[in-house]
Amino acid sequence: MAKKVTGIVKLALNAGKATPAPPVGPALGQHGVNIVMFCKEYNARTADKSGLVIPVEISIYEDRSFTFILKTPPASVLIAKAAGLNKGSGEPNTKKVGSITNKQLESIAETKLPDLNTNNIPQAMKIVGGTAKNMGILIKD
């Protein structure tokens, strides 16, 4: 018989840098999960992706055990990294703060494909392109 899930916690943490301090500690502590064990496992699985924010979905079971699924980094983080920026524009319609090429857009779309609502690259590129536009980043050919 499968274990019964008692809670699902979603967090976005820096890769390889999870610590028992907030937000991890309070989010998992209220479910009675071994926080240090989660931090060690998360850091081990994300060590190769340092510098990125990696969302994680943690399923917590009745016996206080847990499993977690790593998601792809947010499109905005990947776009900002490709454009060499820390953050997007505060006024994306009037102030353009950077640009990325179609090639960079395609590689970001391929990275994000498992977490998007589509299976084809051109549609994924449109989704990621919309995020870039909302960040005030131009897409060049």
From Swiss-Prot:
Protein family: Belongs to the universal ribosomal protein uL11 family.
Name of this protein: Large ribosomal subunit protein uL11c
Primary location class: plastid
InterPro entries: Ribosomal_uL11, Ribosomal_uL11_bac-typ, Ribosomal_uL11_C, Ribosomal_uL11_C_sf, Ribosomal_uL11_CS, Ribosomal_uL11_N, Ribosomal_uL11_N_sf
One GO-annotated biological process of the protein: translation
Pfam families, per database record: Ribosomal_L11, Ribosomal_L11_N
Annotated function: Forms part of the ribosomal stalk which helps the ribosome interact with GTP-bound translation factors.
Residues spanning the signal sequence: none
Disulfide bridge positions per record: none
NCBIfam families attached to this UniProt entry: L11_bact
